[in-house]
Regions:
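Short acidic, low-complexity intrinsically disordered linear motifs used
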Residues: 1-12
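Short, flexible, glycine/charge-rich loop motifs used to bind or transfer phosphoryl groups or to couple energy/partner
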Residues: 9-10, 72-73, 114
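Active-site neighborhood of HAD-like aspartate-dependent phosphohydrolases
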Residues: 11-59
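Non-transmembrane alpha-helical segments in soluble domains
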Residues: 31, 35, 74, 100-104
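Short glycine/proline-enriched coil/turn segments at helix->beta-strand junctions
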Residues: 40, 77-82, 107-110
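Short, acidic loop-to-helix structural element flanking the phosphoryl-transfer center
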Residues: 46, 55-84, 92-97
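Substrate-recognition "cap/lid" segment bordering the active-site pocket of phosphatases
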Residues: 85-114
Length: 114
């Protein structure tokens, strides 16, 4: 694994490794949004209840906030044709489209790199 400072030292783009960045809790503050949606602690709320509340929160995925420091990370990695990784949940049928909307609204990742 390379440290981000090691990537800066590379002079030739062909020498760079692929960069993969997670979405939830790396770029996007999922837990903060989930806590707000359930009106308390997401992890301490009954599983069915918490997902029902998220399902009922219009635009939940598309309107999540950036994680602290995530814009700085994003601005660094986007220069290197980075990939974003994220899973969608079957507990919320809007999660996939919502995450794609968030990425489209807030980033310039190539569609192929998502």
């Amino acid at each position: 694994m390379k440290y981000i400072t090691q990537l800066e030292k590379k002079s030739n783009d062909t020498e760079l490794p692929s960069i993969y960045c997670d979405l939830d809790q790396v770029l996007v503050a999922f837990m903060k949004g989930a806590d707000a949606a359930v009106g308390g602690s997401f992890v301490q709320t009954d599983k069915d209840e918490r997902w029902n509340k998220i399902n009922q929160t219009r635009g939940f995925w598309a309107n999540l906030e950036w994680m602290a420091g995530a814009k700085r990370l994003y601005n660094f990695i986007i220069r290197y044709d980075a990939y974003v990784l994220s899973a969608y949940t079957r507990k919320d049928p809007t999660s996939r489209n919502g995450k794609m909307k968030w990425l489209s609204k807030n980033t310039k990742f190539k569609k192929f790199n998502i």
